[in-house]
Amino acid sequence: MAVPKRKMSRSNTRHRRSQWKAAVPTLVACERCHEPKLQHIACPACGTYNKRQVLEV
């Protein structure tokens, strides 16, 4: 197993950790009602996915 040769400073540790963050989810407009929705997920406003009604809203 690899072992660090030198102690890593707080500054370097925090600088490295600052790059590790969650990405903002991509929103697209629904083709039917034009409400913002997540990609590859049924629209929560009108219940359609891929031009088909899949949820009863």
From Swiss-Prot:
Belongs to the bacterial ribosomal protein bL32 family. Keywords: Ribonucleoprotein, Ribosomal protein. One of its GO terms (molecular function) is structural constituent of ribosome. NCBIfam families: rpmF_bact (TIGR01031). This is Large ribosomal subunit protein bL32A. GO terms for biological process: translation. It comes from Streptomyces coelicolor (strain ATCC BAA-471 / A3(2) / M145). It holds the Pfam family Ribosomal_L32p. GO terms for cellular component: large ribosomal subunit. It comes from the Bacteria. Transmembrane segments: none annotated. HAMAP family: Ribosomal_bL32. The keyword Ribonucleoprotein applies.
